[in-house]
Structure formats: structure tokens, C-alpha cells
């Protein structure tokens, strides 16, 4: 079933997309060897919260972070960690 959106709903979706784009651009700038996935997550969360928004992953079914970061063999929904330090090629 297709649910049609109102112009106000479409504008909210557009605003959310801009916030996500900003967070992803920042993530792309800070991802480098030596950075933890937790640091990346923290910066992503700051961007989202700075727009008075809330990261939808955080606390969803107990997920502890604002983002899912899945380097290498982690297939999906990787939990950011201070122990996961990116290396060259990740």
C-alpha cells in the first residue's frame, strides 16, 4: 500500500535528509586510521542533536548508539566501540 505524504510531511523528510547528509559528510571527513568507531559515532550524534533532532537508532530495541558502524567482517548494525580502532584499509 502506498501512503501519500502531505507537503508538511515531505518537508520534514527533506529536513531529516539534510541532517543525515551533514552527519555522513562529517563522518567521511573524520574516518581515518587511529580513530575509534565510538569517536565517529559521537561526532555523528553531535550533528544530529545540534539540529534538535534525535538519532533514531539510539535506544531502539536496546541499541546503544546513534549510528551503526560496520567495518570489515561486521555485516550490519555494528555497535560503535572505544575498542574498535580503524586501521588502514578499513
PLM features: what roles do these ranges have?
Residues 1-90:
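Active-site neighborhoods and metal-handling regions in enzymes and metal-associated proteins
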Amino acid at each position: 500500500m502506498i501512503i501519500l505524504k502531505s507537503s508538511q510531511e515531505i518537508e520534514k523528510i527533506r529536513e531529516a535528509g539534510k541532517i543525515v547528509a551533514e552527519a555522513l559528510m562529517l563522518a567521511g571527513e573524520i574516518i581515518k586510521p587511529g580513530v575509534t568507531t565510538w569517536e565517529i559515532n559521537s561526532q555523528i550524534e553531535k550533528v544530529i542533536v545540534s539540529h534538535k533532532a534525535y538519532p533514531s537508532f539510539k535506544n531502539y530495541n536496546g541499541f546503544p548508539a546513534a549510528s551503526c558502524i560496520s567495518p570489515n567482517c561486521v555485516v550490519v548494525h555494528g555497535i560503535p566501540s572505544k575498542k574498535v580502532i580503524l586501521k588502514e584499509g578499513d
